């Protein structure tokens, strides 16, 4: 029985090890194709529609989209690019303490005398019941985040109410480590600045991800077998 269990455990470990890719052994992580960041959930690069030609009034040198003389044109159509400024400096600290104490005591007594003929007897009973509970709890949470990044995003969809859906990905490979920055969300055209930039706090449904993959990330993560045991073991 022990041999069967050991064999099954070994086969399970080999199966999980087979899930890991061996294509990047001895090679740095590959970069994603250009355009795939416009649709993070898609497996292929996003294809943008052809830009419609802006209407130019007769005898006019300027189109409606290029009519700003002192500012850059803003992103308004699918395929346009805008710059997202991410500046996060959040700090949070929580401290909770609770204490509860309860004590109860009960005393019960019983005494009696009886006589039968010349025999006399007595009976006594006494009982003490006591209980007590005490609970003390404390908790503290402290978090500090500081992130300052700039990324270019592209307009992937224009909603019926005029809002824009944006998405962008930036990848930087240093040696064998690939750092990936991803941004996605909904933007109101009125919040886009004159220089075609927008701050992250003005993006609704914002999804910001900053991480990476490569040799350092693999070393920092526990092996698949350990992750499996941490999940299934009750102790």
Curated annotation (Swiss-Prot):
It holds the Pfam family FlgH. Its main location: membrane. It is found in: Cell outer membrane; Bacterial flagellum basal body. Disulfide bonds: none annotated. One of its GO terms (biological process) is bacterial-type flagellum-dependent cell motility. A lipid is attached at residue 19 (S-diacylglycerol cysteine). GO terms for molecular function: cytoskeletal motor activity. A lipid is attached at residue 19 (N-palmitoyl cysteine). It is a lipid-anchor. InterPro entries: Flag_Lring (IPR000527). The basal body constitutes a major portion of the flagellar organelle and consists of four rings (L,P,S, and M) mounted on a central rod. Assembles around the rod to form the L-ring and probably protects the motor/basal body from shearing forces during rotation. This is Flagellar L-ring protein. It comes from Chelativorans sp. (strain BNC1). The gene is flgH.
